[in-house]
Structure formats: structure tokens, C-alpha cells
Amino acid sequence: MAIHLQDFAPPQELIPLHPVYQVQDWDDAAGAIDWPRLRASLKNVKEHGALPESHYSHDHLNEQKEIPVPPETTGRWTKRFKDVSDQWSAKGFNVVWALVDGFLLYWDSEVVDALDVKIFLCIPEKVLKQRRHERHGYHTAVQSDPEGSLWRDPPHYWEQIVYPAYVRAHEHLFENGDVEGGKLAPKYEKELVLLSGEGCDKHMGMGEMVDIAAQSILSVSDP
């Protein structure tokens, strides 16, 4: 099951204005996500293995890029997860793995506590900026239309709003607040699995990242 943090953004008309630049601020953690709804949804997944019936995703409206994973990696982990699922089934349980994907996962303490495995993909600012630019916009929810509307960043939105908000939301995870290439703060060294993505000095390949992530998930999945 994939749970997209972006689906928990408030309706467009409820997004607050930035106090300095007077444009809607979709990225400041406090107002970018409907945190009570996300917490309740994760609780529902934990208790019932499913999102609430009222949940609606508009992620399918956004541009989807294929991320190639080595076939041998996919095959190996597909078998491993199936084996674990079968072991749970033999004991009368239906195991559900829920992957929560998002840009602000480690800001809200209640959300953090709900996650059994915490993985952070570290990407330098220049790559983040390029990816944001290449998306050409985001589909967002509005109260009158569940299909949402398309948001496009106005000029200088990245420099003035997006990246400063990203730093504020993640600096507590790293020593000296260095979100670019810093070490994890002692509090998070054992709690957070750190992956080095595109543009990092020690860039991991996709196969290696999948291996680390999958092994971390299975480490808490033993029947």
C-alpha cells in the first residue's frame, strides 16, 4: 500500500499566505499538511490494514516517471516479501506493508512515532530544484472538486519559500542543521536509515537503495 503525504495537503483555498511574500505557502510544515487527518489515517492503517473509506488520492494526476530497478533486485525482494507474507498467512494473519511517501515525514512527532521504519533519502539542493522544475506543477485538492486543480510555482518560489521550508523541516535531523551533507544528529543515528541519492558525494545506485530499504522493512516483519 502506498500512502502519499501530498494527498493530505489542505484544500487549496485553505493554504496560508507566506507572511513576507504574500503567496500561498504549500511547503511550510505547519500549514502544508492536514496533520490530524494524517495521524488518524495512519492509525486506521495500523488497526485495520487500510486507509479510511473517505480517503481520496489525486497522485495519479501528477506526472509519473519510471525509476528503473535492476530486475534481479526486484525478483529477489518480491520473493522474500512473498515468503514472509505466506508465513504470516499460515498463522492466520494477512500482513499489509504500508509505504508512506512524502517531503515532511519527520516533522510531526506523532507521525514519526507511527512509523515502524524510517528512511530518509538525502538529495542536494541543486537536484531537488531541478526535479521540482521538471514536474511543471502539482495537482492539489480543492473543496469543490476532488480531482483538484494544478498548482504551478510562481517566480522565485523555490528560493524564497520551498527550499527554506525544506531546511526548517529537516535541520533537526542533522548535526549543525546541515541538511546537504551533514551527519545524522546523535538522536537519529539509530532511528533513521539514511540513503544517499543522486548528486551526493557517495551516490548509491537504485539497486543498493532498494536493498537497504527492503532489508530494513523485513527486519521488523518477522512472523
Language model: regions and residue ranges:
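Preference for well-ordered, secondary-structure-rich cores of eukaryotic proteins
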Residues: 1-3, 12, 16, 21-22, ...
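Conserved beta-strand scaffold positions in the cores of enzyme catalytic domains, especially
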Residues: 2-4, 118-120, 191-195
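Conserved nucleotide-sensing/catalytic segment adjacent to the nucleotide-binding pocket
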Residues: 10-76
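Conserved AAA+ ATPase "sensor/coupling" helix adjacent to the nucleotide-binding pocket
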Residues: 41-49, 134-141, 173
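Intrinsically disordered, low-complexity domain-flanking/linker segments in eukaryotic proteins
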Residues: 52-94, 142-148, 178-191
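ATP-dependent NMP and nucleoside kinases share a basic, alpha-helical "lid"
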Residues: 73-144
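NTP-dependent small-molecule kinase module
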Residues: 93-95, 134-138, 160-223
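C-terminal regulatory/interaction module of P-loop NTP-utilizing enzymes
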Residues: 107-109, 114, 142-151, 156, ...
